[in-house]
Amino acid sequence: MSRFRGWIQAGATLLTNLHLPNFLKGGLYQGAGKTVCVPGLNCYSCPAASGACPIGAFQAVVGSSKFSFSYYITGFLILLGVLLGRFICGFLCPFGWFQELLHKIPTKKLSTKKLKPLTYLKYAVLLVMVFLLPAFLVNDVGMGDPFFCKYLCPQGVLEGAIPLSLANSGIRAALGKLFTWKFSILLSVIVLSVLFYRPFCKWLCPLGAFYALFNRVSLFQMKVDKNKCVSCGKCARACKMDVDVTKTPNHTECIRCGMCIRACPTNAVSFRYGFGNGKETTKKTTMEESK
């Protein structure tokens, strides 16, 4: 499956953005699909978007004048987390794929191994910008801003503000300092993505942070067969998310990309679906080996 990951990412991005003619019209799809969240980071304001961004939808609920915990969106995210974990990041997220395409540009690449403390930032973004600020920093009528979407998310500029402003002169005339700020963030992510592998995913994405909480318990896991592993270290060197799959098969940073599977010379690493620890493997008995 990992060999076809690029095609799966392209297909997922297309399914998430089915209404392509809207790019020329300068309008948004407002059908029933917008009441359903998509699994990856994809802006609601993208003209082609066929569903709602779960992070944006969650903020809209907690920031409303009548605060109520979003059981539907939270339940949806928990379900996806339990079923797939960060497989969504590696296979189904449009913005993750965008960063990977940028990283393919032939330039010198930089390692993020010494920058591991930055991976904890995304949990702060999830807690503070997605939940606490929209819920408790409100205006006179009791409404909070969607702080992550409004002030940090680069996907909103890439998919929403830029295409809409190009097609709509009214929107173009209304662009101001906030757009300049968000555009600078997008530009920074683009430059960093050329040099580093998935910098936004590693350091700032709150959706990835949420799915990471379920990586160790999700049904979709990485499995390491200790009987086949020769401790060559090729899997760890191949991992661009800085994970040693032989030590922590279902690390919170693992996006199930499958690079370790392709690098393993003995086929000791594999995907598995179901309950159980990825490190556990049933050793063959002498009788079984003799068969």
Task: Name each region found by the language model.
Residues M1-T246, T252-K291:
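Non-ligating segments of multi-cofactor redox enzymes
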